[in-house]
Amino acid sequence: YLDVKQLANYLLCIGNGQVFNGRKTCQIGCRAVCQQPGCSGYKECEQIPNIRLHKYRCHCNEA
């Protein structure tokens, strides 16, 4: 559940919630997209719980 501020942050920051294949790719790509306008820098890459896919979701810091 997202509050209004979190929702606004997700909408403003294009990097938030982007999905990457593999942890390293996510860390590199997420750091780049979290520098875009509306974002406040890289926070973390969260593994999406599916062992076979190795997909990671990008999270940027809240504005």
From Swiss-Prot:
Key word Thylakoid present: no
Post-translational modification: Contains four disulfide bonds.
Compartment list: Secreted
InterPro entries: Megourin
The UniProt record lists the keyword Disulfide bond: yes
Top-level taxonomic group: Eukaryota
GO CC annotation terms, alphabetical: extracellular region
Biological processes, Gene Ontology terms: defense response to bacterium; defense response to fungus; innate immune response; killing of cells of another organism
Induction summary: By bacterial infection.
Keywords carried by this UniProt record: Antibiotic, Antimicrobial, Disulfide bond, Fungicide, Immunity, Innate immunity, Secreted
One matching Pfam family: Megourin
Subunit structure: Monomer.
Function as written in the Swiss-Prot or TrEMBL entry: Has antimicrobial activity against Gram-positive bacteria and fungi.
Protein name stated in the entry: Megourin-1
Organism (species): Megoura viciae
